[in-house]
Amino acid sequence: VPANRADRFGGRDSALAAVPAAGNRREFPMPAHLKFFYGPMDCGKSTLALQMDHNHARQGRSGLILTRYDRSGGALVTTRVGLSHDAIEVTDELNLCGLVRQHWALGRRVDYLIVDEAGFLNPEHVDQLAELVDEYHVDVYCFGLATDFRSQLLPGAKRLMELADAICEIQVEVLCWCGLPGRHNARVIGGRITREGDTVLVADTVATGGHDVRYQVLCRAHYRRGELGQPTLGEQLTLD
């Protein structure tokens, strides 16, 4: 155990010193990684996050699933293909290093973190994720939007792009109504694109709950022009 890590946990004989942080990595350290998978709405980010968790869990690894501002409004990772999984909601006050240490204190392994909606993290959260990777050998896989409805980098996404070991654009292509690749997440209120308002306004690609608010993926040209096209059957699909 590195001396600074043992000291941080209260010495080599503390309860935490006996808990494997990431399998046998504490005895045989291996590099961990911070990876950011990004793409527009509807490209399958949350589905990929749950698949990643499944792949690691089936190999005997133990992880935590986290989210921030899921479309469900709860502490869940949900997908448009009907999959869902309980998750830990990342609040402004939550220290992610402290969260992992709490699990170690209870004798629970934490080999990896799955973080959905990571674009909405605070920069401080991302710094904590980097610390978990570098100092404690915990793998971190983040999934989220890169830009907001103004087509500006989200704070968490910006910091992830600055710190991540790998930045991966999800290859499922989402199309604008014109058929070109869509990369811009337009916020639509009352049938019109809006470019004003809070950065975070939880809604889906189909207006629900009596609120006339939704998001639509557009190509750059139609995003700039504010052109939504004619309503089509495709707008009613709920594929993630």
Regions inferred by a protein language model and the residue ranges of each:
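Extreme N-terminal basic, low-complexity initiation segments
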Residues: P2-R8
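Conserved P-loop NTPase "ATPase switch" module shared by AAA+ and STAND
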Residues: R108-L121
